Structures are given as structure tokens and as C-alpha cells.
Amino acid sequence: MTGPEWAHTRGTKVGQSSRTPPKVAVLLGGPSVEREVSLSSGQACAAALRDEGYDVVEIDAGHDLGARLIDAGPDAVLNCLHGRWGEDGCVQGLLEWMGVPYSHSGVLASALAMDKQRSKDAFVAAGLPVVPSVIAKAADVRMGHVMQPPYVVKPNNEGSSVGVYLVHEAANGPPQLSEDMPQEVMVEAFAPGRELTTTVVGDRALTVTDIVTDGWYDYDAKYKPGGSHHVVPADIPADIFDLCMDYALRAHHALGCRGVSRTDFRWDETKGAAGLILLETNTQPGMTATSLTPEQAAVTGMTFGKLCAWMVEDASCDR
């Protein structure tokens, strides 16, 4: 079955298209719990791409996404969706089937990165340091400690610190998880220390950011103005800085990521290099005004508009 007349040959990059300027569909919103963050990311990227001279259409992704893409006829998709359906391989599979070049990682890497336990398995196989974790039933977690505190409970397949519970060392009782938590959750040993993160663009690690907060780096700290303070480049020892850069690139490759990814760490400075722990890799990092990836790109000389343009020009199928 042939694709629509605007579909590209698989593997073709947008920069090779004959249409000038390229028409870009920015996917945003969607039905996940991270909808609001996605709207902010998508709107910011759409505005930046227009400033860069692209013909942009914004699509709030829903069940009619395929039909809306056919109507729009884009040269490429900039995927600014966050959370389930948008960054877990589902939308990527639709775009592959339709033959529409798209940004970020492909089906397999997206699905693997969204599954925190399986991505950890890939990190371990690549020789990267992670903390112990188990998959447990939410009902069992509510009944008693499934791991010696301190530990963290989180959905196995959500991002942006949505639904994350920190159980302190002195906690007498188990966490009372909300009823909207999935039936199975990840329970992970708490990694103390400083919050560090590194973005990879293509095959290049950009820099390291030290994320300073007054407490737990939760959803509000990530996305609300003033919720956290970013020190970039991070003021940390050179060997730890270099390890973050190395680990982020290795994690990117271990999952098979493409385009842009961001890897988060915890560093216990009392333990030196042995205290650096890889937490997770995000295949579609936030692109809001307070987001880490645009900030890191700016430090390396890449404006927000140029970063968005790079992602569009990098778009392809068979990712």
C-alpha cells in the first residue's frame, strides 16, 4: 500500500525535501497526564519554528490524529507530546506506518525508555550504574514496605515526576498511594545527593546542569517558575562532569535513541565517582520556558529556534 503523496521515502531527512519552506506539524497536548506540559512545549516550539521560517501547523493529538495529519500534509512532524501514547512508541508507530518523517526516537527506543524497569535492564547491560528496584503491585505497596526505606515509588511508565512518592528512612508505615496509580509500580532504592542532568543532541552530549531545589524535585519543581534553580554548566569536579557526559551518551546508545534525549543522575559527592547514579533517560525532554534541554543548548551556542530547527531537519522514518 502506498502512502499519501506527501510521504517521504523511508530514511529521507526533511532537509532533502523539495518543498520550501518545509511544512511542519507540531504534535502537542494529547490525552496523557502530562498534557499541560506538552501544550507548553509544543506552543513554544511552534512559535520558534515560525520565527525560523517554517510553515507550521499545531495539532492537538487525539483519536483522529491520522486523519488530521493527512489533511495537514506535513513534510515532517515535531513530536512535542509527553507521557503515554506520545512518547512510548504509539505515535511513532503511526508515523512510521504513514511514512511521515518525525523527530526524536523511534518505536523501540521510545517504548523501552518509557518502561523504567526494562530501560534499567538495558543500562545494566551497558555497564551503567543504577540503584536496585523491583516491580510490585500497588496494593502490596500500600500494605507494607516492599523494600527497606528510604525508597521511591513511581509509575513504571510515566514521566515528569508524575505520581512519585518518596518514603523516608524514618517512615513507620507504607506509602498511601492514590487510587489513580497503576496496578503495578516501580519501587526503587532512594539515591541521595545532587540532581544532575545531561542532554544529548545527535551524537553529542551538551553539558551538565546541577538542579538546585529546596526539597524533592517533583512536578512543580520541574515546571513552575521558581520551582528550581539551574546551575549550568554544573560546578562539579571535572571527573564527575565527564562521567555525566559519557554516561548520557552511552545511555542514549544503549536504548537506541535518536535525535534529542536527556539523562538524569543523582550524585552523592561523599562517594566521589562511585556516588554517581543514572536515574533515567527521557527520549522527549521538555521544551518549555523553564526546561533544561533548551537551557543547555543555549550554553553551547544553540538558540532555542536553532534547536527546534535541528530536530525538524533531523526528522526521518525508520528511527
From Swiss-Prot:
| Cofactor(s) it depends on | Mg(2+); Mn(2+)
Q: Which UniProt keywords apply?
A: ATP-binding, Cell shape, Cell wall biogenesis/degradation, Cytoplasm, Ligase, Magnesium, Manganese, Metal-binding, Nucleotide-binding, Peptidoglycan synthesis
Q: Which PROSITE patterns does this chain map to?
A: ATP_GRASP, DALA_DALA_LIGASE_1, DALA_DALA_LIGASE_2
Q: Where in or outside the cell?
A: Cytoplasm
- The reply to whether Membrane figures as a keyword in the UniProt entry is no
Q: Which GO terms describe its biological process?
A: cell wall organization; peptidoglycan biosynthetic process; regulation of cell shape
Reaction catalysed? 2 D-alanine + ATP = D-alanyl-D-alanine + ADP + phosphate + H(+)
Q: Where is the ATP-grasp domain?
A: 120-313
How does the cofactor bind to this protein, according to its record?
Binds 2 magnesium or manganese ions per subunit.
Q: What is its EC number?
A: 6.3.2.4
Q: What is its main location?
A: cytoplasm
Part of which pathway? Answer: Cell wall biogenesis; peptidoglycan biosynthesis
Q: Which GO MF terms are attached to this record?
A: ATP binding; D-alanine-D-alanine ligase activity; metal ion binding
Binding of ATP occurs at 147-197
Q: Which Pfam families did the record assign? A: Dala_Dala_lig_C, Dala_Dala_lig_N
Sorted alphabetically, which SUPFAM superfamilies does this protein's record hold?
Glutathione synthetase ATP-binding domain-like (SSF56059), PreATP-grasp domain (SSF52440)
Residues given in the record as Mg(2+) 2 binding sites = E280, N282
Under the cellular component aspect of Gene Ontology, which terms does the record hold?
cytoplasm
| Its job | Cell wall formation.
Q: Which family does this protein fall into?
A: Belongs to the D-alanine--D-alanine ligase family.
Q: Which PANTHER family match?
A: D-ALANINE--D-ALANINE LIGASE, D-ALANINE--D-ALANINE LIGASE B
Q: What is this protein called?
A: D-alanine--D-alanine ligase
The species this protein belongs to is Roseobacter denitrificans (strain ATCC 33942 / OCh 114)
